[in-house]
Swiss-Prot record:
GO molecular-function terms, A-Z: ribosome binding
Cross-referenced PANTHER family: RIBOSOME MATURATION FACTOR RIMM
Domain-related comment: The PRC barrel domain binds ribosomal protein uS19.
Entry-linked SUPFAM superfamilies: PRC-barrel domain, Translation proteins
Name assigned to this protein: Ribosome maturation factor RimM
GO biological process: ribosomal small subunit biogenesis; rRNA processing
InterPro entries given in the database record: PRC_barrel-like_sf, PRC_RimM, RimM, RimM_N, RimM_N_sf, Transl_B-barrel_sf
Family note: Belongs to the RimM family.
Keywords, comma-separated and alphabetical: Chaperone, Cytoplasm, Ribosome biogenesis, rRNA processing
Subcellular location: Cytoplasm
Domain PRC barrel: 97-176
Subunit structure as annotated in this protein's UniProt entry: Binds ribosomal protein uS19.
């Protein structure tokens, strides 16, 4: 892993709200207000990250809106619509040994306990009971699978996660 990690995307700026530069916020954090625990934000404009600070935020019905420092008009806010919100990777808190950020699991090779390479984690789906790894099978998968969905349940299906090697060991039948 390089010493300079990519910023971690936490949300997206939505449409403008009102005439004073407020924006609706789409957040990917566990709790809606969790995105405001991070400062400063990075927003991506024309392929470049730039630092911004939240001046104020509030709940607006079921939505959450924010005003960024230096953004005072509706036109300025509209220019930022759909920009990604991120933070430097260094701002992310360290997790306990048995917990992982999704971004660290995506791209990991998935090997079952019999040594069969099941493919690569493409995305993770949140269900009500547990997260599920969406594993894209290798092009020449011996079982004719294009993808597999493996529940991320430690000690039952997930035997070991080795982030340094980018590998996840699973107890999962490749024919599933």
């Amino acid at each position: 892993m390089s010493s300079k990690q990519e910023p971690v995307i936490l949300g997206k700026l939505g449409s403008s709200f009102g005439i004073k530069g407020w924006l609706k916020i789409t957040t990917y954090t566990d709790s809606v207000e969790g995105i405001f625990d991070y400062s400063p934000w990075l927003i991506k404009e024309q392929g470049e990250w730039r630092e911004v600070k939240v001046a104020q935020w509030r709940f607006q019905g079921k939505a959450v809106v924010a005003c960024l420092e230096g953004v005072t008009t509706r036109d300025e806010a509209q220019a930022l619509t759909n920009c990604e919100i991120a933070v430097p990777a260094e701002q992310m808190q360290d997790l306990p040994e048995d917990e992982f950020y999704w971004r660290d699991l995506i791209g990991c090779e998935v090997i079952n306990t019999k040594g069969y390479n099941m493919g690569t984690v493409q995305e993770i789906v949140e269900t009500g009971s547990n997260d599920v790894l969406l594993v894209k099978a290798n092009a020449k998968d011996g079982f004719g699978k294009a993808e597999r969905m493996i529940p991320f349940v430690t000690d039952q299906f997930i035997q070991k996660v080795d982030l340094a090697a980018k590998q996840i060991l699973v107890d999962w039948d490749p024919d599933f």
